[in-house]
Amino acid sequence: MFYGREEQKKRLFSMIDRDEQMISLIYGRRRIGKSELIKHTLRESKVRSIYYECKQTAEANNVDSLSEIIGEEFDFPKPLFRNMEETLDFLFKKSEEMSLILVLDEYPYLRECIQGLDSILQALIDKYKDTAHMKFIICGSYVDTMKALLAKQNPLYGRIDLTIELKPMDYYESALFYEGFSDEDKVRLYSVFGGVPYYNRLVDSSKSVRENIIELIASPGARLENEVSMYLNSEISKITNANEVFEALAKGFSKFKDILDQSHVSSGPTLVDVLDKLIRMDVVKKEMPINDENNKKKAGYFISDNLSLFYYKYVFRNISRMNIMDVDVFYDKYIAEDFETKHVPKIFEDVCRQYLIRCNKKGLFSEPFEKIGKYYYDDSVNKKNGEFDIVTWDDKGYVFYEAKFRKDAITEPMIEEKIAQVKQTNLDCYKYGFISRSGFVCKESEDRILISLDEIYKE
């Protein structure tokens, strides 16, 4: 079953329907669903297609494999091409007679074994641009390599008609994988497996959240136990530095200086390099407060990939214990309480941010906001700095939001206390929003926005 990605499918079909040659670049981190998106689109399209997954082998082997697919698709004996340029030229020429989709998946593998492949493609694209009906899709997981194809100095510069950087699904699309679970459990599952389709399709609806976590990530030999380290090893040469940074981030250290102090990374410039790489890999994000966006000192770094966060928070540091303990005893001692009282509520804040953005994009707010994020303030009473996690800004001013993932309903005294706390920081809000897992016991008013959990998952 294929879930979500409606926007990306729409863009791909729009490209395929054009009566001219079109070149597309699709990239994103491993396991994010690039190949499945393309295959699903090909299945739904009526246009003839050649899908080839490039291999980490010599050019001759790739030519032989692609030639075999070509022979099968066009129902003639396998053609004997001398090289990849000849093979691709045949397909481009074929597309002068008919619409044809050509997909080169895992393109960086082919690029490694064929010198000057980008230039070869450029020559073919230019040669057939006015006569072919080729829909050429280049796809790959090595983000730096794929982004380099868009650079000004690359031969393909200016020839890509459609670029799709596939990102993790949001909480709503991810929940499509969690059929049969309550809304509360959907938040819990998302807090572990995030928006990566490959992880989410492993969730077993016949088992509890706890059982899924233990079987997939928190037990010796679990299906995803080595997933995080494998991804890092495929992209980063010095894995030790990445592990150090992840451990510091998982403990809650988010400021550059604190990360440097907590980790054993040798220097500031080295830490900058590691963080930049992790950000490009889509596993770490850098956030600036919306009221001080240009102040580098107030930048915060956070693990954005939920599986990586869970792994480094609970598994990585306790892996020796996990390997010799009963899985349920280990879960109860090192995961259960912190997961429910701290981890899930923190991820729930991110879910709420995503929900607000979804509403904003749909035009559901009378005043659409232009900024959303953390708000930095100086607490003069307690002589310390602080942050509010969810604040939006629109033409009328700021709106503050408080997200609570707790068993009890949000009450009137709680709301009044929080509003008083916000006013004490001199944050001038014209509305106050509250988002609750367990509903509300309070009065409504024009300056309040009350959102319950079921609204977040409503169609």
Where are these regions (language model features)?
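A cross-kingdom feature that marks ATP-driven nucleic-acid transaction machinery
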Residues: A299-E459
